[in-house]
UniProtKB/Swiss-Prot annotation:
Residues 459-507 are annotated as: Interaction with the nucleocapsid (N-RNA). Homotetramer. Interacts (via multimerization domain) with polymerase L; this interaction forms the polymerase L-P complex. Interacts (via N-terminus) with N0 (via Ncore); this interaction allows P to chaperon N0 to avoid N polymerization before encapsidation. Interacts (via C-terminus) with N-RNA template; this interaction positions the polymerase on the template for both transcription and replication. Residues 137-307 are annotated as: Disordered. GO terms for biological process: DNA-templated transcription; viral genome replication. Belongs to the morbillivirus P protein family. The modification Phosphoserine is found at residues 86, 151. This is Phosphoprotein. Residues 279-301 have a biased composition (Polar residues). It comes from the Viruses. The keyword Endoplasmic reticulum does not apply.
Length: 507
């Protein structure tokens, strides 16, 4: 309901802005009004006759709402009274249109939409809205005579906000109570309307739904409203509100006497309090702590306080649960990251194992083709261990027959050889190797792994330069020795320089 009311308010404001931006000619307004009066005369004649009889009984005339004030035009809302009543309305409207120097007006047909969203077509079915395009405070809007039949508001249903339904035909209607009329509604009034609607929804919803409390308003005291429905012996149903008083003390305010008579049976007013111009403040009941409070105000405030406390506690519980979920999520993410790192380490270990398996297979393949070297050859003849006999039964490491390698290098196989002395177990094998397999003795006059013998080659000079650079001598002496090495010519001089260098390094 609140959304529909806000929709109508927005539509009304758009209509007012359009009328202010593009005012019509007064002649066009007069012609449109005359056409509207002629169209609505025949349809409202029967209903207005019954309204006149009821108005005579109540001693009231057709309702007209004057709007007089500074900066406003005096305009009346007159329902069609037949052939005689329409002339008075035409005269007043003609006088209002004649004053074109002060105000400019226009008539616009406001399209009415029912609750299903369907548009009501036709001039007769629409609300004829007369809008004054003057100042903002002086804008008054009213509808035509056919609005009670084609309006989108059902007068038989009670208003959820608690306001009485309007009888568009015979009873005086306030423009503020019509949902289809266009009004200038301020932002504060819209906010109050939304607050009342949300408060009613909060009272009717189940307790499981989390409802945010409305914004507190200091202008209007909060009170629990209860709709009242009872018969009034007429076609419509009276709808009102019953609210508990939030006042803690004082007197009943005097109310102005209404100028309109009752439209139905009289109601008893025996319990109404008389007005008072002056009253002394009342004291509430004192509590044990010494503070003065009111039982009524406490009964009104305590439900709201309890609701606020419950809402606050629920919000705190939700925040705590969300924080715990966040902490658990962080722990899970940390463990997942550790699992990812472990997976990488496992993959690297598997790769290393596969590499080691390949290396072991390669080594096994190499060992299958390697034989043990026979010791005793390639030695210096002057070495005392040079005459040691070689074991002829030496076997290879892997996959070789007994004596296979030795039989290939010996002049005679070991099985065919016989020992000279039958009493000796050893088999003499010296000089039995083939000549091509025997190692040559080391020459003392040439360079080998055991000594360096310089000659006139470039390699010998490079070796001597390396010896000088790697020595512990000073830089000056190194430079001096390098210069001497460059000046030496011949192998003999180079050998003498090498001997001198060895002596210098030993000292």
């Amino acid at each position: 309901m609140a959304e529909e009311q806000a929709y109508h308010v927005n539509k009304g404001l758009e209509c007012i802005k359009a009328l202010r931006a593009r005012p019509l000619d007064p002649l066009v307004v007069e012609e449109a009004l005359a056409a509207w009066v002629e169209t609505s005369e025949g349809q409202t004649l029967d209903r207005m006759s019954s309204d006149e009889a009821e108005a005579d009984h109540q001693d009231i005339s057709k309702p007209c709402f004057p709007a007089a004030g500074p900066g406003k035009s005096s305009m009346s809302r007159c329902h069609d009274q037949g052939l005689g009543g329409s002339n008075s309305c035409d005269e007043e409207l003609g006088a209002f249109i004649g004053d074109s120097s002060m105000h400019s007006t226009e008539v616009q047909h406001y399209h009415v939409y029912d609750h299903s969203g369907e548009k009501v077509e036709g001039v007769e079915d629409a609300d004829s809205i007369l809008v004054q395009s003057g100042a903002d405070d002086g804008v008054e809007v009213w509808g035509g005579d056919e609005e009670s039949e084609n309006s989108d508001v059902d007068s038989g249903e009670p208003d959820p906000e608690g306001s009485a339904p309007a009888d568009w035909g015979s009873s005086p209607i306030s423009p503020a109570t019509r949902a289809s009329d266009v009004e200038t509604v301020e932002g504060d009034e819209i906010q109050k309307l939304l607050e009342d609607q949300s408060r009613i929804r909060k009272m009717t919803k189940a307790g499981k739904t989390l409802v945010v409390p409305p914004i507190p308003s200091q202008e209007r005291p909060t009170a629990s409203e209860k709709p009242i429905k009872k018969g009034t012996d007429v076609k419509s149903t009276s709808s009102g509100t019953m609210a508990e008083s939030s006042s803690t003390g004082g007197a009943t305010r005097p109310a102005l006497k209404s100028q309109w008579g009752p439209s139905g049976p009289n109601a008893s007013a025996e319990n109404a309090l008389a007005s008072a111009s002056n009253v002394s403040p009342t004291q509430g009941s004192k509590t044990e702590s010494g503070t003065t409070t009111s039982r009524i105000s406490q009964s009104n405030i305590e439900p709201e306080d309890d609701y606020d406390d419950e809402l606050f506690s629920d919000i705190q519980d939700i925040k705590t649960a969300l924080a715990k979920l966040h902490d658990d999520q962080q722990i899970i993410i940390t463990r997942l990251e550790s699992l990812v790192s472990l997976k990488g380490e496992i993959d690297s270990i598997k790769k290393q194992i596969s590499k080691q398996n390949i290396s072991i297979s390669t080594i096994e393949g190499h060992l299958s083709s390697v034989m043990i070297a026979i010791p005793g050859f390639g030695k210096d003849p002057n070495d005392p261990t040079a005459d040691v006999d070689i074991n002829p039964d030496l076997r290879p490491i892997i996959g070789r027959d007994s004596g296979r390698a030795l039989a290939e290098v010996l002049k005679k196989p070991a099985s065919e050889r016989q020992s000279k002395d039958t009493g000796k177990l050893g088999i003499e094998s010296k000089g039995l190797l083939k000549k091509e397999f025997q190692l040559k003795p080391i020459e003392k006059k040439s360079s080998s792994a055991i000594r360096f013998v310089p000659d006139g080659s470039v390699a010998s000079r490079s070796v001597i330069r390396s010896i000088i650079k790697s020595s512990h001598l000073g830089e000056d002496r190194k430079d001096y020795l390098m210069s001497l090495l460059n000046d030496i010519q011949g192998s003999k001089d180079l050998a003498q320089f090498h001997q001198m260098l060895v002596k210098i390094l030993k000292n």
